[in-house]
């Protein structure tokens, strides 16, 4: 039983009773409608889940939406049936971050305006909280229009493209584009007439399109052969996007009567403007193909020409054209041959064959074939490529045989050449006098001539001399249309060898001797020569790409660096190379605080060449130019007179850094099994505990290995010169300068830094300290415009207190057998440590040293690993460096340290950090007190009586010398970017001395230096004998006075063959 309909129906009620509601994405929501009649729902999508019931006279309808998405956003309408007279609505929002705008079920029709009409742009959002603006794409301006999230933008809009932009949670989202067109006509009208095919066969369909652009209110008129017979229905299609209208005429089952002119006239009704276009259609009753050759039956081409052969083809439809040579199809895959088919007209074509640089083998029969289905036609011609004659071979087959002498001349060419023979009996004039050559008498009984073709299609002419007297010259001539060539051969009668044979043998021996000498000279030149890697920059080109280096031999050398040979005792060899060696020694009288000091002495081997001696002297001069610094191996003195050159430098207790890291690797790994603990130790230091922390960075370390200098106390030493009988040498002691008297006066914190605490072992803080100290040392070298060129862990030494010393150890290293050095020309280079500009452009600067510093960091934090592990220096390695390959982070480096490496490895040198910046960056990774402690140690070093410091002070205080300033020095200082005043305080007063007095003679010098001796020390070095090892009483005080004498001699300059 159905309820009775009331006379007045009220609007149904929707629950929940809201105008709009927001539901979650992918959720389920229900809407319930109650009314007095049957109910129906309408929504943004088809609703298939709807239940209806009747309770207490009320109709109830419920819709359920599962998995709500953006498409469910919209207005839901509940209507009373059957009249739909009343209805209620609710608007549902389903916010979807991925779909900010509601997808439209029907596409937006491009709106066309004749003026500014009010219209609606239906960009509705799924999130009601979104802020939406309308953007005009042409001007990128925001349009002042009101927005309704349930409808979109409504207002007056001009022609253009619009986009709705929604701002949701700080991000912009753009809708699809909405295009609004303005009406135009008259002057913009353009008409085009197109045909799918202009030539057809009987029975095909003719299709002609008349396209009108730029106007919309148009009228079309057609003229064509079948119009009177009412053939050809017309269709109209409008493309509103591009304002184009297509009028299409179609004529089916075409016949030859439909051939003719087809014309289309379009008239703009608004402006009455008209345009007419026409074209010609041809209908054939059968297919056809014909070839009209433009070449003859025989064609010629010269060698290396680019001949072109053409044929005209009349065909309908388009033909398939094939070219053949000697019945073989010529394909497009052959680079020397190209074939093309050009369309000249509707039924006119041209076939073209091109030979790229014609060759002899291109001669042959050519055919062009044109096909249309079962119809085909062809044309053939012969091509001859003309080749100049050539004599392939001319040999004396039976030289001096009993059967006579036979000469064979093999000749080729196209066309085949004719072969003739000439003979010359006066050998002295055959080369210069052509009249001496006469045609060979082939009718003679003593001569036989035969002609034949060989397997290579060459002409062979055989001439046999049955009886030959003396020596004659025979000439073979080959000639054809392209020219003539000839070759000669000398024939000798059988008998003793002529003088020519003897001369040839002597010539061969002479050539062998010359080649041997050249090989020996090349081998001698390729033998590597010793050269100091350090360079001092004199000037820089304006573009910064060319550097001029100071010639070290032009630097002055002050004799106050001289140290008496009899004050120096040599010991064991610390390192030996191809050119020289470094020997441990003890110096007496270098310093007041240390009458006896352990030192390292550089010297050449007895077999050294003059170039090596000059290089060692250059190294000495550069070291005197640099001055002292805590983190370089400082010069203490030199011996350059009355014997070989010795350079006396600081003694480094632990040897080089590579082997020190190898030696302590196991202990380091045992303490750092957990990387997190290591990072905490580096960066998680509690400032409150900092004062009580032991700075092991400068503490005494465990036993070294390579060049281990700690074993010196057990060795027996060799005195350089024999002293008088009363003189005694004391045993060589461990150098006390590593802890000079001035250092012992530090406060407790400094003493903690210099304590000999070997229990701590190698720590991560040590690795950072080494990194910082090397940066400070290189910062100092850069301030002196000095380029190292071989910065690597093997050239970094470690002294007591873990103080890093930068050096150049090339003299005492066998680089020819060291895998770290690669042969390039006559030298060996550390390629894996070199910057790209140094490898490829031979450019060395402070910035190329920065690259090497990055490689050194990798060595330190890999605990002495070899850079680019597993990679061989070859072309592949160089290509990887060019393409930007860089090493991965070493195991024990933090991300900050690795970032520093990558900055050093920037492919653009000017973008690499300076050493000043590098030292500041590394200092920020260390405890705050470390840098203060380092500066205090450095300050006390510069205020101590270290020989390197005191000798420089003597030179600085001497008014008899003036400084040398180099060109562009200010520019190079600027490139080093900010060397602060405090850091330069150690060397700001140091200048390169120039002599203004005549150098003293050796005689005068020997009078001043009462410790000098004329005894040669070569025998002492070579025999290894040792004098007494006890120093006589009172001699130390006399030796100390040497320092005072050095400071008093202001004019002593050393000058010999190497200065």
Swiss-Prot record:
Top-rank taxon, per record: Eukaryota
Phosphotyrosine sites (modified residues): 547, 549, 695, 706, 717, 729, 737, 821, 961, 990
Catalytic activity line of the entry: L-tyrosyl-[protein] + ATP = O-phospho-L-tyrosyl-[protein] + ADP + H(+)
EC number: 2.7.10.1
Basic and acidic residues bias locations: 975-984
GO molecular function: ATP binding; platelet-derived growth factor alpha-receptor activity; platelet-derived growth factor binding
Residues on Cytoplasmic side: 525-1059
Disulfide linkage: 33-78, 123-164, 210-264, 409-476
Chain intervals for the UniProt region annotation (Disordered): 975-1036
Regulation: Present in an inactive conformation in the absence of bound ligand. Binding of pdgfa and/or pdgfb leads to dimerization and activation by autophosphorylation on tyrosine residues.
Membrane topology: Single-pass type I membrane protein
GO cellular component, one term: cilium
Keyword Disulfide bond appears in the UniProt entry: yes
Residue ranges with Polar residues bias: 1012-1029
Entry keywords, A to Z: ATP-binding, Cell membrane, Cell projection, Chemotaxis, Developmental protein, Disulfide bond, Glycoprotein, Golgi apparatus, Immunoglobulin domain, Kinase, Membrane, Nucleotide-binding, Phosphoprotein, Receptor, Repeat, Transferase, Transmembrane, Transmembrane helix, Tyrosine-protein kinase, Ubl conjugation
Active-site residue numbers: 790
InterPro entries: Ig-like_dom, Ig-like_dom_sf, Ig-like_fold, Ig_I-set, Ig_sub, Ig_sub2, Kinase-like_dom_sf, PDGFRA
Pfam family name, one: I-set
Domain Ig-like C2-type span(s) in chain numbering: 32-91, 103-180, 189-282, 293-380, 389-477
Residue span(s) of domain Protein kinase: 568-942
GO biological process: cardiac muscle progenitor cell migration to the midline involved in heart field formation; cardioblast cell midline fusion; cell migration; cell surface receptor protein tyrosine kinase signaling pathway; cerebellum vasculature development; chemotaxis; embryonic cranial skeleton morphogenesis; embryonic neurocranium morphogenesis
TM helices/strands, residue ranges: 504-524
SUPFAM superfamilies associated with the record: Immunoglobulin, Protein kinase-like (PK-like)
Role: Tyrosine-protein kinase that acts as a cell-surface receptor for pdgfa, pdgfb and pdgfc and plays an essential role in the regulation of embryonic development, cell proliferation, survival and chemotaxis. Depending on the context, promotes or inhibits cell proliferation and cell migration. Plays an important role in the differentiation of bone marrow-derived mesenchymal stem cells. Required for normal skeleton development. Required for normal development of the gastrointestinal tract. Plays a role in cell migration and chemotaxis in wound healing.
Family: Belongs to the protein kinase superfamily. Tyr protein kinase family. CSF-1/PDGF receptor subfamily.
Protein name: Platelet-derived growth factor receptor alpha
Gene source species: Danio rerio (Zebrafish)
């Amino acid at each position: 039983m159905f309820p009775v309909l009331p006379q007045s129906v009220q609007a149904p009620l929707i629950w929940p009773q809201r105008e709009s509601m927001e539901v979650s994405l992918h959720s389920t929501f229900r809407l319930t409608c109650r009314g007095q009649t049957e109910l129906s729902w309408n929504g943004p999508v088809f609703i298939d889940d709807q239940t209806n019931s009747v309770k207490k006279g009320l109709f109830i309808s419920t819709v359920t939406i599962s998995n709500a998405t953006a498409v469910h956003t919209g207005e839901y309408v509940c209507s009373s049936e059957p009249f739909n007279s009343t209805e209620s609505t609710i608007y549902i929002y389903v916010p979807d971050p991925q779909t900010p705008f509601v997808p439209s079920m029907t596409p937006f029709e491009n709106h066309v305006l004749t003026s500014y009409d009010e219209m609606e742009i239906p960009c509705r959002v799924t999130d009601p909280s979104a802020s939406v603006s309308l953007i005009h794409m042409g001007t990128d301006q925001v349009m002042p229009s009101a927005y309704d999230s349930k409808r979109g933008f409504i207002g007056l809009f001009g022609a253009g493209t619009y986009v709705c932009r929604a701002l949701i949670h700080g991000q912009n989202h753009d809708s699809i584009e909405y295009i609004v067109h303005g009406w135009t006509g008259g002057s913009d009208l353009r008409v085009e007439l197109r045909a799918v095919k202009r030539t057809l066969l009987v029975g095909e369909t003719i299709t002609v399109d008349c396209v009108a652009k730029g106007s919309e209110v148009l009228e079309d008129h057609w003229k064509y052969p079948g119009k009177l017979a009412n053939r050809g229905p017309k269709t109209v299609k409008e493309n509103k996007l591009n304002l184009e209208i297509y009028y299409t005429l179609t004529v089916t089952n075409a016949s030859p009567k439909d051939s003719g002119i087809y014309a289309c006239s379009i008239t703009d009704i608004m402006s009455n403007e008209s345009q007419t276009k026409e074209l010609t259609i041809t209908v054939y009753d059968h297919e056809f193909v014909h070839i009209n050759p433009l070449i003859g039956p025989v064609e010629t081409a010269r060698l290396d020409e680019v001949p072109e052969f053409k044929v005209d083809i009349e065909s309908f439809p388009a033909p398939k054209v094939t070219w053949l040579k000697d019945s073989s199809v010529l394909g497009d895959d052959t680079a020397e041959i190209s074939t093309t088919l050009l369309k000249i007209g509707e039924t006119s074509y041209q076939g073209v064959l091109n030979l790229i640089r014609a060759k002899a083998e291109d001669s042959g029969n050519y055919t062009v074939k044109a096909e249309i289905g079962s119809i085909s036609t062809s044309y053939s011609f012969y091509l001859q490529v003309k080749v100049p004659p050539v004599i392939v071979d001319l040999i004396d087959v039976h030289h001096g045989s009993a059967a006579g002498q036979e000469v064979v001349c093999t000749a080729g060419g196209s066309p085949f050449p004719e072969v003739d023979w000439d003979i010359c009996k006066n050998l002295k004039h055959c080369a210069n006098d052509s009249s001496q050559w006469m045609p060979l008498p082939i009718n003679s009984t003593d001569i036989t001539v035969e002609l034949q073709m060989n397997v290579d299609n060459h002409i062979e002419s055989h001439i046999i001399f049955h009886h030959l007297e003396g020596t004659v010259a025979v000439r073979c001539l080959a000639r054809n249309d392209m020219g003539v060539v000839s070759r000669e051969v000398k024939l000798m009668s059988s008998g003793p060898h002529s003088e020519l044979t003897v001369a040839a043998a002597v010539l061969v021996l002479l050539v062998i001797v010359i080649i041997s000498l050249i090989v020996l000279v090349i081998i001698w030149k390729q033998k590597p020569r010793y050269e100091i890697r350090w360079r001092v920059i004199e000037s820089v080109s304006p573009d910064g790409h060319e550097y001029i280096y100071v010639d070290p031999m032009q630097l002055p050398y002050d004799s106050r660096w001289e140290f008496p040979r009899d004050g120096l005792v040599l010991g064991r060899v610390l390192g030996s190379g191809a050119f020289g060696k470094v020997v441990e020694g003890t110096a007496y009288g270098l310093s007041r605080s240390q009458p006896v000091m352990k030192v390292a002495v550089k010297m050449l081997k007895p077999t050294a060449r003059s170039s090596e001696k000059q290089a060692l002297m250059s190294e000495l001069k550069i070291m005197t130019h640099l001055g002292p610094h805590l983190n370089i191996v400082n010069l203490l003195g030199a011996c350059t007179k009355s014997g070989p050159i010795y350079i006396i430098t600081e003694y480094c207790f632990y040897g080089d850094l590579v082997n020190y890291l190898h030696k302590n690797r196991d202990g380091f790994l045992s303490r750092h099994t957990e990387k997190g603990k290591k990072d905490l130790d580096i960066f998680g230091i509690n400032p409150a505990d900092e004062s009580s922390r032991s700075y092991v960075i400068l503490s005494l370390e465990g036993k070294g290995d390579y060049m281990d200098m700690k074993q010196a106390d057990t060795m027996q030493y060799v005195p350089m010169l024999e002293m008088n009988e009363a003189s005694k040498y004391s045993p060589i002691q461990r150098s006390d300068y590593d802890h000079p008297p001035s250092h012992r006066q530090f406060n407790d914190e400094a003493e903690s830094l210099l304590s000999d605490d070997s229990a701590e072992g190698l720590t991560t803080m040590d690795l950072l300290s080494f990194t910082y100290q090397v940066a400070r040392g290189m910062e100092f070298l850069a301030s002196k415009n000095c380029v190292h060129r071989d910065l690597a862990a093997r050239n970094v030494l470690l002294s007591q207190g873990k103080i890093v010393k930068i050096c150049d150890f090339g003299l005492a290293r066998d680089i020819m057998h060291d895998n770290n050095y690669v042969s390039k020309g006559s030298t060996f280079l550390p390629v894996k440590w070199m910057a790209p500009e140094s490898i490829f452009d031979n450019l060395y600067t402070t910035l190329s040293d920065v690259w090497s510093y990055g490689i050194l960091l990798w060595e330190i934090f890999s605990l002495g690993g070899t850079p680019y592990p597993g990679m061989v220096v070859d072309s592949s390695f160089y290509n990887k460096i060019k393409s930007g390959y860089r090493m991965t982070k070493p195991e024990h480096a933090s991300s900050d340290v690795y970032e520093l490496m990558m900055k050093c490895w920037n492919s653009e040198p000017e973008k690499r950090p300076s050493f000043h910046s590098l030292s500041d960056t590394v200092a920020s990774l260390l405890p705050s007190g470390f840098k203060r402690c380092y500066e205090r140690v450095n300050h006390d070093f510069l205020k101590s009586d270290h020989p390197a410091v005191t000798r420089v002070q003597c030179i600085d205080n001497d008014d008899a010398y003036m400084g040398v300033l180099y060109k562009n020095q200010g520019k190079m200082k600027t490139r080093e970017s900010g060397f602060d005043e405090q850091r330069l305080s150690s060397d700001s007063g140091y200048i390169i001395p120039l002599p203004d007095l005549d150098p003293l003679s050796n005689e005068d010098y020997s009078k001043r230096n009462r410790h000098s001796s004329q005894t040669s020390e070569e025998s002492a070095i070579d025999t290894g004998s040792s004098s007494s090892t006890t120093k006589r009483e009172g001699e130390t005080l006399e030796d100390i006075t040497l320092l005072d004498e050095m400071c008093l001699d202001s004019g002593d300059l050393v000058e010999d063959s190497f200065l």
